[in-house]
Amino acid sequence: KELVIKSYKNLYFTKYQDRLEIKGSIHCYFNDEPHNANDFYISDCIDTIIEIKTIFNLDLNKCYLINLEYGINIKPNIPVPELILNLIYHEKRPFNRPRKFDYKIAGNEAYKHVKAYDKSVQFPNLCNNTFRFEVKTKQAKFINNLGIYTLQNLTEKTHYETIINSLLKEWDNVLLFDKSKKIDSKYYNPQFWEECLMAKNRNKFNNQKKSYYTKLGNDNLHTIIKKTMERKHKYLKSMHI
């Protein structure tokens, strides 16, 4: 039974008979505004969690994580709308475009889904040509598989390496059309990839994706975006620590 709902700086507290649930974005709490368009350094995240702990006298070891959303903002070398347009699959799940604003989502299950969107459309006064790639889960099982269980874990810098590695792994699973490269046109045909998924050989899709990226060469757009993410992570990790 739900008893009491309170809010404080973009955090929402719901008191039940047997537990307290806290929902909200730590990034938005830090900004004291409902946006996450700016850079959020790892040290800022840790300091913010400790501040919340102090204000509300929380035992972070008893604050179990059920939902988690993490991502990274980068400025790609092409217009973000063009980048999003050419996002085709994550793993074997197609990217779909809802109507709200310029973003795509792959998967909608509680365990995991990924989102890619144009942050500068969402917050045009705060950033420009900014691409956000994020992972969201509503199951503790996914979070626990990262070795993360409680808010206390998110005050420890080592766990952020696990988080960024998870994010990069999910990006590795993305099929991105790079039409700047002149290769067999079948690779830019969505029907070709659908047929790969329907093939009796269940490995055909992954094998063809590997072949596609090999044909593109090392300087392909997918690889460039990944390297940009890696550089951004190093920047966020090095600042203010």
Predicted regions, residues:
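Short, solvent-exposed alpha-helical "recognition" segments
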Residues: K210-I225
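Structured, helix-rich domain cores that form ligand/interaction pockets
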Residues: K1-L197, H222-H240
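Helix-turn-helix DNA-binding segment
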Residues: R202-K210, I241
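Residue-level recognition of well-ordered secondary-structure positions
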Residues: K23, K136, N206-N207, Y213
